[in-house]
From Swiss-Prot:
Keyword hit for Heme: yes
Function description: Bifunctional enzyme with both catalase and broad-spectrum peroxidase activity.
Tryptophyl-tyrosyl-methioninium (Trp-Tyr) (with M-252) cross-link, renumbered residues: 105-226
This protein's name: Catalase-peroxidase
EC number: 1.11.1.21
Length: 726
């Protein structure tokens, strides 16, 4: 570290002092703007996963590449890999099946149904923080074992698909019949920045299960996938873990039966590793020295691998046949009496005190041990509801196999969206309710049909605001994380969306559009709702003096109520939608942060978000018809007035109350209130990044550009769930 004496001495010798010290001179080094302003709005979340980070280029077509894959040759290679034990990470009982199942499970298990983020769909286990989570110790070895296969098949199989397929093959090679496999997960090339993993600053900080219901978190401790296997906060109490298990699995959309099946099925094969104290384990992959080449957790205990391996610190083998599928998990769970003990690493676990030594040692065939289980395994015996399910599975192994097959498929495909996104020869034919199924198309409107429908909509008496609002309400439920929601299916007309507060005004247009749909018989209601938005935007642009054609692609269908899981669709109800100036709760985040959250779910860039908000305001599309943010005297005209007036220094803004959610814009000279605004409006003048974009649209030469940008962003949102157009 340089001192003043160092600088004096180097100056005296003629050497540049700034090349002598220990200061970080690399790009991005030093104190950052986020260090100075930690609450800075995360506009950068809208710039993730651009083509600039993609080495494959924007023309790469994964579905096309996958079609060239020797799928069954790949599965054959994966099966062979399972028993090709490597000396740098020897396989337990000569099989990597348990390791690969855990890799797939922990990749998929980050999914949270409350916001649709997380999951295995983008291969995020390769990147921080997941590649270095405490619950993912040793999965770096699993991924490295797969590298020769990934190298062989190249871009015909993504890492994201390979992780899940490896888990499937591991189960199948162990004698289990899986439900199927759908490929289609495309890799990204940098960590997701939008996933909220929690506020804790230390790994394995405990969370109360009740807190999980108020936030989109999927684990009871920072750095875990689900729950602490030693019980809540290392309590060692099986019964007390029930609430935590239900909360975490419930946040993934799993019911009690699926939860029991997943825990038992996941613990039928393989083992945990706790040969010695975890203090022997070195830094995780992100913190490991460069020569470790992306591997982490190097152990100094014995050989550090094989019989000396330390992963969780628990040393548990559940079944007598840890490389072959069986019902031994339930048989052992109920047959024996379990006594709390500790692993060689000191972790709390249970041992079957009255059982003979029937469990094979993973590396020494001459040794046997007693069955062992995790604290949370015993929850399946001692919680009354879990016990009922577990005993049924004990007495009906086929029911267990079926339940696990379906739950595993759901676990590993939950974030992929509708079945139409699946590719490959093993996609199950059955439609499942959690896939948000849609019927087959029955309409095929011609160009003339569309023209006729547009005339009917234009003559319906619905205003521009009503037309735009109903289309936005239908399409804006889309979530980029799990590909749920969107306009296809016209679920705006079904429960629960029809009764959401945010849609109260928008759905008033539905009876008119439903009448047009029935009278024409030429298109689905879903298409007509989107077409209503087309008519509204074109009318608004025309009123602004511009002749604009808004692209429209028919082909949407109408879902039935029985194809709609009301409980799961309730999760799509927005806490806030800044595009409509809607906010339901004030106890979560700031309004402007929630606007960014919504825009990110809609896969929008900062300019796209800016154009849409500015356009929605002048079109009068606020959810409640309020004038907040409507900085124009010509509502329904697609002008750039929102930006012009927002940036006009004639007005000063003051909060209307202590909540600082609503503001009045007063004329600086007269004091007259000219406009009212929300935080979702004023952020475009306050935040430096968004203001830079707003200044473009407020310029005297920007009106036509603004309209074209608005239309492009609008069409993007309307088509977010049109996977058939890809």
């Amino acid at each position: 570290m340089s001192t003043s004496d160092d600088i004096h001495n180097t100056t005296a010798t003629g050497k540049c002092p700034f090349h002598q010290g220990g200061h970080d001179q690399s790009a991005g080094g030093g104190t950052t703007t986020r260090d100075w302003w930690p609450n800075q709005l995360r506009v950068d979340l809208l710039n993730q996963h651009s083509n600039r980070s993609n080495p494959l280029g924007e023309d790469f077509d994964y579905r096309k590449e996958f079609s060239k894959l020797d799928y069954y040759g790949l599965k054959k290679d994966l099966k062979a890999l399972l028993t090709e034990s490597q000396p740098w990470w020897p396989a337990d009982w000569g099989s990597y099946a348990g390791l690969f199942i855990r890799m797939a499970w922990h990749g998929a298990g980050t999914y949270r149904s409350i916001d649709g983020r997380g999951g295995a769909g983008r291969g995020q286990q390769r990147f921080a923080p997941l590649n270095s989570w405490p619950d993912n110790v040793s999965l770096d070895k699993a991924r490295r074992l797969l590298w020769p296969i990934k190298q062989k098949y190249g871009q015909k199989i993504s890492w994201a698909d390979l992780f899940i397929l490896a888990g499937n093959v591991a189960l199948e090679s162990s004698g289990f019949r899986t439900f199927g496999f759908g490929a289609g997960r495309e890799d990204v090339w940098e960590p997701d920045l939008d996933v909220n993993w929690g506020d804790e600053k230390a790994w394995l900080t405990h969370r109360h299960p009740e807190a999980l219901a108020k936030a989109p978190l999927g684990a009871t401790e920072m750095g875990l996938i689900y729950v602490n296997p030693e019980g809540p906060d290392h309590s060692g109490e099986p019964l007390s873990a029930a609430a935590a298990i239900r909360a975490t699995f419930g946040n993934m959309g799993m019911n009690d039966e699926e939860t029991v099946a997943l825990i038992a099925g996941g613990h039928t094969l393989g083992k945990t590793h706790g040969a010695g104290p975890t203090s022997n384990v070195g830094p995780d992959p992100e913190a490991a020295p460069i020569e470790e080449q992306g591997l982490g957790w190097a152990s100094t205990y014995g050989s550090g691998v094989g019989a000396d391996a330390i992963t969780s610190g628990l040393e548990v083998v559940w079944t007598q046949t840890p490389t072959q599928w069986s019902n031994y998990f339930f048989e052992n769970l109920f047959k024996y009496e379990w006594v709390q003990t500790r692993s060689p690493a000191g972790a709390i676990q249970f041992e079957a005190v009255d059982a003979p030594e029937i469990i094979p040692d993973p590396f020494d065939p001459s040794k046997k041990r007693k069955p062992t289980m995790l604290v949370t395994d015993l929850t399946l015996r001692f919680d009354p509801e879990f016990e009922k399910i577990s005993r049924r599975f004990l007495n009906d192994p086929q029911a267990f196999n079926e339940a696990f097959a379906r739950a595993w498929f759901k676990l590993t495909h939950r974030d992929m969206g509708p079945k139409s996104r699946y590719i490959g020869p093993e996609v199950p034919k059955e439609d499942l309710i959690w896939q948000d199924p849609l019927p087959q198309p029955i309409y095929n409107p011609t160009e003339q049909d569309i023209i006729d429908l547009k005339f009917a909509i234009a003559d319906s008496g619905l205003s521009v605001s009503e037309l735009v609002s109903v289309a936005w309400a239908s399409a804006s439920t889309f979530r980029g994380g799990d590909k749920r929601g969107g306009a296809n299916g016209a679920r705006l007309a079904l429960m629960p969306q029809r009764d959401w507060d945010v849609n109260a005004a928008a759905v008033r247009a539905l009876p008119v559009l439903e009448k047009i749909q029935k009278e024409s018989g030429k298109a689905s209601l879903a298409d007509i709702i989107v077409l209503a938005g087309v008519v509204g935007v074109e009318k608004a642009a025309s009123a602004a003096g511009l002749s604009i054609h808004v692209p429209f692609a028919p082909g949407r269908v109408d879902a039935r109520q029985d194809q709609t899981d009301i409980e799961m669709f309730e999760l799509l109800e927005p806490i806030a939608d800044g595009f409509r100036n809607y906010r339901a709760r004030l106890d979560v985040s700031t309004t402007e942060s929630l606007l960014i959250d919504k825009a990110q779910q809609l896969t929008l860039t900062a300019p796209e978000m800016t154009a849409l908000v500015g356009g929605m305001r002048v079109l009068g599309a606020n959810f409640d018809g309020s004038k907040n943010g409507v900085f124009t005297d010509r509502v329904g005209v697609l002008s750039n007035d929102f930006f012009v007036n927002l940036l006009d220094m004639r007005y000063e803004w003051k909060a209307t109350d202590e909540s600082k959610e609503l503001f009045e814009g007063r004329d600086r000279e007269t004091g007259e209130v000219k406009y009212t605004a929300s935080r979702a409006d004023l952020v475009f003048g306050s935040n430096s990044v968004l203001r830079a974009v707003a200044e473009v649209y407020a310029s005297s030469d920007a009106h036509e550009k603004f309209v074209k940008d608005f239309v492009a962003a609008w069409v993007k949102v309307m088509n977010l769930d049109r996977f058939d157009l890809l």
